[in-house]
Amino acid sequence: MTKRWRADRRKDHYYKKAKAENYRSRATYKLKQIDYRFDLIQPGDIIVDLGASPGGWSQVAVELGGPESKVFSLDIDRMPPMEGVTFIRGDIKDDVTVRRLLDMIPEGANVVISDMSPDISGNYSYDHAKSIELCEYALAFAKKILRDGGNFCVKMFYGDMSKGFVKMVERSFEEAHVHHPKASRPASSEVYVVGLEFFSERD
């Protein structure tokens, strides 16, 4: 991270807003805006947050789900404890981690959210492909754990493989949308793919 990047971040509206409102990251506002648009999370929902650290999306999940909700947060890195959140350190690409989550939530989840991002190499084609790979892991997990009617949201770096991934989402959800929330930086290639009302795949 360069000095210029740090200086630009300090000037960023959502970065300053997150600091002032005691949120762990500016990404908090992306999920707030996505939920406002698509009504992803309902009170009492069981929510799984993939790539959760440092916890900004988990904070929003707890807020929107309320005291009756359950939030399970997964990341390969550590995350400071958070009231109302069960944290699991692991990799969604690891079958043992996936099985552990499924065993922890035998009743299934209402919502799966993912703000996972690959390590950026600077080669956009490579980074896009790695982003799609993470999206596919998130979707595969969502299809294992979501209840009928459940919702899904995943970050994706937009590129030539994006339409194919959106079609995969369309096969398992009544609605699929691609959304660029206002809190995403204007120059960013990131978008969020939202799947609403999960169903088992049909022929």
Where are these regions (language model features)?
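Class I SAM-dependent methyltransferase Rossmann-like catalytic core
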Residues: 1-43
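A short glycine-rich, Lys/Arg-flanked "PGG" loop and its adjoining helix->strand segment in the class I
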Residues: 132-148
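Glycine-rich helix-loop-beta junction characteristic of Rossmann-like nucleotide cofactor-binding loops
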Residues: 36-42, 105-106, 144-145
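Short glycine-dipeptide loop
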Residues: 67-68, 145-151
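S-adenosyl-L-methionine
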Residues: 74-121
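Class I S-adenosyl-L-methionine
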Residues: 159-203
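Conserved class I S-adenosyl-L-methionine
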Residues: 43-53
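Conserved SAM-binding loop of SAM-dependent methyltransferases across substrates and taxa
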Residues: 54-67
